[in-house]
């Protein structure tokens, strides 16, 4: 089972990715993790990527797709995989298809921008431990304080409204077109497309995923 997850930052992809990995026994392939691993291992692609990154440039689609192909050839991907953070653009999706990397399911988590801003803006983090709270969904026992240590909680820059709205603008411009791309792929019989309402409770979304994917 080869799965791609689509959805804006904060739409709940990470949470559902954990559920899918556990249920279907497939690894999550994150382009960030792959890049770090390839650089650490000193592979040809890793060295090439490091050179580009050291110059402060973006790693090309060719390098990323090379890494994806290497990664999915490994044993733990024989039953499938979950692609996270890739493809992000139509050229990447085209290049992936040309490289012979097919997809069985494309899952879109649909969440309005304002809901995402509320979700992410409500996050509070304990920097030392990485514990994450939410003022609405998972509040600390004492407002603004970590449950275990009593230390002050912070709002990460990434979770501030201005930053979130910038990231959402990039998503709508670059990645949202993939919704149409994979919908068309599904109509052509190349994959199945699933659009889920990501505003519902986590358990409900997981249950619907399990039902749809079988």
From Swiss-Prot:
<feature type="region of interest" description="LID">
    <location>
        <begin position="122"/>
        <end position="159"/>
    </location>
</feature>
<dbReference type="GO" id="GO:0044209">
    <property type="term" value="P:AMP salvage"/>
</dbReference>
<comment type="subunit">
    <text>Monomer.</text>
</comment>
<feature type="binding site">
    <location>
        <position position="123"/>
    </location>
    <ligand>
        <name>ATP</name>
    </ligand>
</feature>
<feature type="region of interest" description="NMP">
    <location>
        <begin position="30"/>
        <end position="59"/>
    </location>
</feature>
<keyword id="KW-0545">Nucleotide biosynthesis</keyword>
<dbReference type="GO" id="GO:0005524">
    <property type="term" value="F:ATP binding"/>
</dbReference>
<keyword id="KW-0418">Kinase</keyword>
<dbReference type="InterPro" id="IPR000850">
    <property type="entry name" value="Adenylat/UMP-CMP_kin"/>
</dbReference>
<feature type="binding site">
    <location>
        <begin position="57"/>
        <end position="59"/>
    </location>
    <ligand>
        <name>AMP</name>
    </ligand>
</feature>
<feature type="binding site">
    <location>
        <position position="156"/>
    </location>
    <ligand>
        <name>AMP</name>
    </ligand>
</feature>
<feature type="binding site">
    <location>
        <begin position="85"/>
        <end position="88"/>
    </location>
    <ligand>
        <name>AMP</name>
    </ligand>
</feature>
<dbReference type="Pfam" id="PF05191">
    <property type="entry name" value="ADK_lid"/>
</dbReference>
<comment type="pathway">
    <text>Purine metabolism; AMP biosynthesis via salvage pathway; AMP from ADP: step 1/1.</text>
</comment>
<comment type="function">
    <text>Catalyzes the reversible transfer of the terminal phosphate group between ATP and AMP. Plays an important role in cellular energy homeostasis and in adenine nucleotide metabolism.</text>
</comment>
<feature type="binding site">
    <location>
        <position position="92"/>
    </location>
    <ligand>
        <name>AMP</name>
    </ligand>
</feature>
<feature type="binding site">
    <location>
        <position position="200"/>
    </location>
    <ligand>
        <name>ATP</name>
    </ligand>
</feature>
<dbReference type="GO" id="GO:0004017">
    <property type="term" value="F:adenylate kinase activity"/>
</dbReference>
<dbReference type="InterPro" id="IPR006259">
    <property type="entry name" value="Adenyl_kin_sub"/>
</dbReference>
<dbReference type="InterPro" id="IPR027417">
    <property type="entry name" value="P-loop_NTPase"/>
</dbReference>
<keyword id="KW-0808">Transferase</keyword>
<keyword id="KW-0963">Cytoplasm</keyword>
<dbReference type="Pfam" id="PF00406">
    <property type="entry name" value="ADK"/>
</dbReference>
<dbReference type="InterPro" id="IPR007862">
    <property type="entry name" value="Adenylate_kinase_lid-dom"/>
</dbReference>
<feature type="binding site">
    <location>
        <begin position="132"/>
        <end position="133"/>
    </location>
    <ligand>
        <name>ATP</name>
    </ligand>
</feature>
<comment type="similarity">
    <text>Belongs to the adenylate kinase family.</text>
</comment>
<feature type="binding site">
    <location>
        <position position="167"/>
    </location>
    <ligand>
        <name>AMP</name>
    </ligand>
</feature>
<feature type="binding site">
    <location>
        <position position="31"/>
    </location>
    <ligand>
        <name>AMP</name>
    </ligand>
</feature>
<dbReference type="GO" id="GO:0005737">
    <property type="term" value="C:cytoplasm"/>
</dbReference>
<keyword id="KW-0067">ATP-binding</keyword>
<feature type="binding site">
    <location>
        <begin position="10"/>
        <end position="15"/>
    </location>
    <ligand>
        <name>ATP</name>
    </ligand>
</feature>
<dbReference type="InterPro" id="IPR033690">
    <property type="entry name" value="Adenylat_kinase_CS"/>
</dbReference>
<keyword id="KW-0547">Nucleotide-binding</keyword>
<protein>
    <recommendedName>
        <fullName>Adenylate kinase</fullName>
        <ecNumber>2.7.4.3</ecNumber>
    </recommendedName>
</protein>
<feature type="binding site">
    <location>
        <position position="36"/>
    </location>
    <ligand>
        <name>AMP</name>
    </ligand>
</feature>
């Amino acid at each position: 089972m080869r799965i791609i997850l689509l959805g804006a930052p904060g739409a709940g992809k990470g949470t559902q990715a954990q559920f899918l990995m556990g249920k279907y026994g497939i690894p999550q392939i994150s382009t960030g993790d792959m890049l770090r691993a390839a650089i650490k291992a000193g592979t040809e692609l890793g060295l090439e990527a490091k050179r580009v990154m050291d110059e402060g440039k973006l790693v090309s689609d060719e390098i990323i797709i090379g890494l994806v192909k290497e990664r999915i050839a490994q044993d733990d991907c024989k039953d499938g995989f979950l692609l996270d953070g890739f493809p992000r653009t139509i050229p990447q999706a085209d290049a992936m298809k040309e490289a012979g990397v097919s997809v069985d399911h494309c899952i879109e988590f649909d969440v309005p921008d304002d809901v995402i801003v509320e979700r992410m803006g409500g996050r509070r983090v304990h920097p030392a431990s990485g514990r994450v709270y939410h003022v609405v969904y998972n509040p600390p026992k004492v407002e603004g304080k970590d449950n275990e240590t009593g230390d002050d909680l912070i709002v990460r820059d990434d979770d501030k409204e201005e930053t979130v709205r910038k990231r959402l603008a990039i998503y709508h411009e670059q990645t949202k077109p993939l919704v149409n791309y994979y919908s068309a792929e599904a109509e052509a019989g190349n994959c199945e497309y699933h659009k889920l309402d990501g505003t519902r409770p986590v358990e409900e979304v997981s249950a619907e995923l399990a039902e749809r994917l079988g």
